[in-house]
Regions:
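Polybasic (Lys/Arg-rich)
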Residues: 1-83
Length: 83
């Protein structure tokens, strides 16, 4: 499950991530979609390319993997850590 800000969803809808993409919930602020795909490097890259415009809700293993990669990216740009 991936959650997007509602104002970004029209782009996601017109450029689907995968043929299995389905909208599962929508509220005043967000839209959640479901994909029936294998978690792989390409999916991780797609998620990371959306930056703060996407949040992985499920599976937790993917959410944790994205979190680890973002932590590593933050470390790469931390001026104190690079000393």
């Amino acid at each position: 499950l991936l959650c997007f800000p509602k104002d970004e969803y029209p782009y996601v809808a017109t450029k689907p991530w995968h043929g299995s993409q389905k909208k599962v919930t929508e509220d005043e602020c967000t839209v959640t979609i479901e994909l029936d795909v294998v978690v792989n490097y390409e999916l991780e890259q797609k998620i990371l390319s959306w930056g703060n415009y996407v949040e992985v809700l499920q599976p937790l293993s993917l959410r944790n993997q994205i979190h680890k990669r973002l932590d590593r990216n933050t470390y790469n740009y931390d001026p104190i850590a690079k000393r």
